[in-house]
Amino acid sequence: MRLKIGFILRSLLVVGSFLGLVVLWSSLTPRPDDPSPLSRMREDRDVNDPMPNRGGNGLAPGEDRFKPVVPWPHVEGVEVDLESIRRKNKAKNEQEHHAGGDSQKDIMQRQYLTFKPQTFTYRDPVLRPGILGNFEPKEPEPPGVVGGPGEKAKPLVLGPEFKQAIQASIKEFGFNMVASDMISLDRSVNDLRQEECKYWHYDENLLTSSVVIVFHNEGWSTLMRTVHSVIKRTPRKYLAEIVLIDDFSNKEHLKEKLDEYIKLWNGLVKVFRNERREGLIQARSIGAQKAKLGQVLIYLDAHCEVAVNWYAPLVAPISKDRTICTVPLIDVINGNTYEIIPQGGGDEDGYARGAWDWSMLWKRVPLTPQEKRLRKTKTEPYRSPAMAGGLFAIEREFFFELGLYDPGLQIWGGENFEISYKIWQCGGKLLFVPCSRVGHIYRLEGWQGNPPPIYVGSSPTLKNYVRVVEVWWDEYKDYFYASRPESQALPYGDISELKKFREDHNCKSFKWFMEEIAYDITSHYPLPPKNVDWGEIRGFETAYCIDSMGKTNGGFVELGPCHRMGGNQLFRINEANQLMQYDQCLTKGADGSKVMITHCNLNEFKEWQYFKNLHRFTHIPSGKCLDRSEVLHQVFISNCDSSKTTQKWEMNNIHSV
């Protein structure tokens, strides 16, 4: 009997507990009239946060948590019309508004629902003049070799006996590897920062980072000096790993020797090898997938040297706001002597914003008064419309939420603009950081280059540009095609997922971007006028064309065999009467006769008129005609004579393929 009573009591207890849980669950279930769906979504995202405790070791779990918004690798499909989608959604939003739908605030907040909210608490940096910053070295940096060559970034000039070896190394690697190999991998460098940078104090609760370096057939000492400089000048608690992506190199020193060498760092440095040549762009996306330990991804080119206290200023803005992407100030390492100097241009402090002309060539323009007014001190980070692309830092998850790089971009070129536009137009910020400086070696003339693999096809960079403008420039893309008319018929693949990304994230228009962020671009590079005609300028019924021969800024154009490949033989004449090639104009030389090519803006060298039916170019200021000597291969102007066959020309369109 006692057994039955105990069994009954236990049964009643279980049933009662179950009913109590049901009542509690019902009380917590959201009702249809719940006023804060945004809050619930954010709470759910926090619960699923793969790095909920950022104040700890900051190690991210497996890569299955990170899925690109844009499918990767590249898939082909069909282009969609973003404007038609916008019009349809606009009509839908208006219907919701009239029907008592969401408030304008709710609609604006939707832009950020696909990005994880900021959960990391970080205090703003504090400037304390005269008090050395908490991340500044307390003692002068030790040299790699006392009194050694290249220490303190002083130039190393070799004698004439090294000339042949130097030329061979430049041809193979793009740098003077003879000098580089003589310089310590741990050499000391000069400090090019403003004095004020030394007195910034940063919250020590910084995010950790994975440094990603992509290389293809890089010289040994320039690559390893990049790695050594990062390890030497980065506080160890923040450096989660250095990830090297070997993009299908075939140099022997980048195989077993590299594998053995990096064992010195007990797993801190890792190398992953691509099974085929992917190109710099997609290799960086691969690097993001392989780098799993750091909260921030820092991309460096394979021939850099980070400077003193580079890390804290670069990562601090990201620690405060995860949608900020930062770029260090890039100094120039001379590829011959390895001296480090500030990059030219910019304002009186050497500060510049990243920009472009309408043919999509990278430019630097001085910091504007408006941007200066946004800062309290001259060493604070400042806004830039674009980055050069080789060196930057971005929160890892945010980069994945942005979809990494467009998977349709190939090898190199245009990716710096694509990621810049994507960040700005979709709710992020791009900041240049004056107190974080990194030296970079630029390839020297005479380098043989790294040709793209056969599977890529021709004109990969131009195709990249077309993809970028088709996705991000909206109606401004017409200005690109005015500057690069040969690209109008260029196939650029499927961009439907990229446009869907823009729509899903309520990314702003390029017009907004040009007015609010890149407002100074048109003052330096005015919108180009329409073209009257474009193509090769061929001597009428001949096989000879005008060729710039790669000359710029004052060189004379010549006559050469027509090759139908564009490039140095591609010109355009616009409604402003300018005869142009990229950002260069044709004009008469100092002798008043020979025709030269020189840099111009839209207010210069409005000198030419093309009479298509007459096959004639007239030089307006002189009233003379464009002429040629097929014997001397010269191009000049002379008195107009309708009987002279050498004054007859035709422009034939050339389309890139």
UniProtKB/Swiss-Prot annotation:
Cysteines joined through disulfide linkages: C197-C435, C426-C507, C545-C562, C585-C600, C625-C640
EC number: 2.4.1.41
Key words, A-Z: Disulfide bond, Glycosyltransferase, Golgi apparatus, Lectin, Manganese, Membrane, Metal-binding, Signal-anchor, Transferase, Transmembrane, Transmembrane helix
Chain positions recorded as Mn(2+) binding sites: D301, H303, H440
Membrane topology: Single-pass type II membrane protein
GO molecular function (one): metal ion binding
Necessary cofactors: Mn(2+)
Localization: Golgi apparatus membrane
UniProt-annotated stretches for the region Catalytic subdomain B: 381-443
Span list, region Disordered: 31-66
Lumenal side: 30-657
Domain Ricin B-type lectin span(s) in chain numbering: 532-652
Annotated GO biological process: protein O-linked glycosylation
Ranges facing Cytoplasmic side: 1-6
Pathway: Protein modification; protein glycosylation
Principal location class: Golgi
Binding positions for substrate per the UniProt entry: D247, R277, W412, R443
Domain free text: There are two conserved domains in the glycosyltransferase region: the N-terminal domain (domain A, also called GT1 motif), which is probably involved in manganese coordination and substrate binding and the C-terminal domain (domain B, also called Gal/GalNAc-T motif), which is probably involved in catalytic reaction and UDP-Gal binding.
Name assigned to this protein: N-acetylgalactosaminyltransferase 7
Biological source species: Pongo abelii
Gene: GALNT7
